[in-house]
């Protein structure tokens, strides 16, 4: 779809467009005739105020090169003009979240979501360990840290990397000034997703809280677990002076204590190679219609249990039947 056609559509009352807008240039060009009103209808096409090719034929969304006009969400007009195709607005009303304590005495998981600006949505999961202090700190301060960086840094992958490192540094200062010595061993995973303009999805993570994108019934991995099982992570830990030991269940741990190689917090393991620098991933997430729905799932490691990505994907796809659902 041409950008010029979209701009013309917006100027011609695009804010009233829903599923099908019909316009006619002949009526617009003839000043002697009365200006017709716009119609939003799924019935037979009517005359319209303009057409994209000057042929005088009634115009619909299909005339603008859109192969699927079954868009159920409101349209983000500025991003649609920018990218040259209609982009559905993702509302926070379509965001679902839940937390269950399971068999633990204390729930150390935290989650958050917010609309940071007109263009950017924020989603986050923090799975704490060694107490909830680090997860609570991220839950309280990460959103503001990202907000402060948004005007300065346009690259969202770089922005999230800076935010993770700043939060880790701030938590370190907070813990060392505190009289509570347990803060030195408190840590958390962090998986944060930013959605800009309804189309640019960027995910950053440390630890093993996974994020996947469910698309057409198939899972797309957005994160990779940071564990000593990864050869590159294991080698990095050793080069930093740490070691990997296996417990009675055959699970590798950094210095025999931590099951992940990257986290926010865990200050007592910083000199052993446990870092807060995230790995990031950026994709375009544009969808059309309910048949091509997209669901992003961000889940702490413990919630996955024995399930594989494909099984989690199937379960969530059945639960979120509408397009643009987020969890």
UniProtKB/Swiss-Prot annotation:
This protein's GO CC annotations: mitochondrial matrix
Pfam families membership: PP2C (PF00481)
Binding site for Mn(2+) 1: 127-128
Top-level lineage group: Eukaryota
Cellular compartments annotated: Mitochondrion matrix
Cofactor: Mn(2+)
Pathway field: Protein modification
InterPro entries (alphabetical): PP2C (IPR015655), PP2C_BS (IPR000222), PPM-type-like_dom_sf (IPR036457), PPM-type_phosphatase-like_dom (IPR001932)
Residue intervals of the PPM-type phosphatase domain: 94-327
Main localization (coarse): mitochondrion
Binding-site positions, Mn(2+) 2: 127, 292
SUPFAM superfamilies: PP2C-like
Transit pept. (range): 1-29
Positions of the UniProt region annotated as Disordered: 33-55
Enzyme Commission (EC) number: 3.1.3.16, 3.1.3.52
GO molecular function: [3-methyl-2-oxobutanoate dehydrogenase (lipoamide)]-phosphatase activity; metal ion binding; protein serine/threonine phosphatase activity
This protein's UniProt keywords: Hydrolase, Magnesium, Manganese, Metal-binding, Mitochondrion, Phosphoprotein, Protein phosphatase, Transit peptide
Cofactor: how and how many bound: Binds 2 Mn(2+) ions per subunit.
Modified-residue entries (Phosphoserine), positions: 248
Reactions accelerated catalytically: O-phospho-L-seryl-[3-methyl-2-oxobutanoate dehydrogenase] + H2O = L-seryl-[3-methyl-2-oxobutanoate dehydrogenase] + phosphate; O-phospho-L-seryl-[protein] + H2O = L-seryl-[protein] + phosphate
Region (Critical for association with the BCKDH complex) residue spans: 46-61
Role of this protein: Serine/threonine-protein phosphatase component of macronutrients metabolism. Forms a functional kinase and phosphatase pair with BCKDK, serving as a metabolic regulatory node that coordinates branched-chain amino acids (BCAAs) with glucose and lipid metabolism via two distinct phosphoprotein targets: mitochondrial BCKDHA subunit of the branched-chain alpha-ketoacid dehydrogenase (BCKDH) complex and cytosolic ACLY, a lipogenic enzyme of Krebs cycle.
Similarity field: Belongs to the PP2C family.
Subunit structure and binding partners: Monomer. Interacts with E1 and E2 components of the branched-chain alpha-ketoacid dehydrogenase (BCKDH) complex; this interaction requires colocalization in mitochondria. Interacts with BCKDHA but not with BCKDHB of the E1 component. Interacts with the 24-meric E2 core composed of DBT monomers with a 24:1 stoichiometry; the N-terminal region (residues 49-61) of PPM1K and C-terminal linker of the lipoyl domain of DBT (residues 145-160) are critical for this interaction, whereas the lipoyl prosthetic group is dispensable.
Protein name: Protein phosphatase Mn(2+)-dependent 1K
């Amino acid at each position: 779809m041409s950008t010029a056609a979209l701009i013309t559509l917006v100027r011609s009352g695009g804010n009233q467009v829903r599923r099908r807008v019909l316009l006619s240039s002949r009526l617009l060009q003839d000043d002697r005739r009365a200006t017709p009103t716009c119609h939003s209808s799924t019935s037979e096409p009517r005359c319209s105020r303009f057409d994209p090719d000057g042929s005088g034929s009634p115009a619909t969304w299909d005339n603008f090169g859109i192969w699927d006009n079954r868009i159920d969400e409101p349209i983000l007009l500025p991003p649609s003009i920018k990218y040259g195709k209609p982009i559905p607005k993702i509302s926070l009303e379509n965001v679902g979240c839940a937390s269950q304590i399971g068999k633990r005495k204390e729930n150390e998981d935290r989650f958050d979501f917010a609309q940071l600006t007109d263009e950017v949505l924020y989603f986050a999961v923090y799975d704490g360990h060694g107490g909830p202090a680090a997860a609570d700190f991220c839950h309280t301060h990460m959103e503001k840290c990202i907000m402060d960086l948004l005007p300065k840094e346009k690259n969202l992958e770089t922005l999230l990397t800076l935010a993770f490192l700043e939060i880790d540094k701030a938590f370190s200062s907070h813990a060392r000034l505190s009289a509570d010595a347990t803060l030195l061993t408190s840590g958390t995973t962090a998986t944060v997703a930013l959605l800009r303009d309804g189309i640019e999805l960027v995910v950053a993570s440390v630890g093993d809280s996974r994020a996947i994108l469910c698309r057409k019934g198939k899972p797309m991995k957005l994160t990779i677990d940071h564990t000593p099982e990864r050869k590159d992570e294991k080698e990095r830990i050793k080069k930093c002076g740490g070691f990997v030991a296996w417990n009675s269940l055959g699970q590798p741990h950094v210095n025999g204590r931590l099951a992940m190689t990257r986290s926010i917090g865990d200050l007592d393991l910083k000199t052993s190679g446990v870092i807060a620098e995230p790995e990031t991933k950026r994709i375009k997430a544009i969808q059309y219609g309910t048949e091509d729905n997209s669901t992003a799932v961000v889940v702490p490691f413990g919630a996955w249990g024995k399930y594989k990505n494909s099984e989690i994907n199937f379960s969530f796809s059945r639960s979120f039947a509408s397009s643009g659902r987020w969890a």
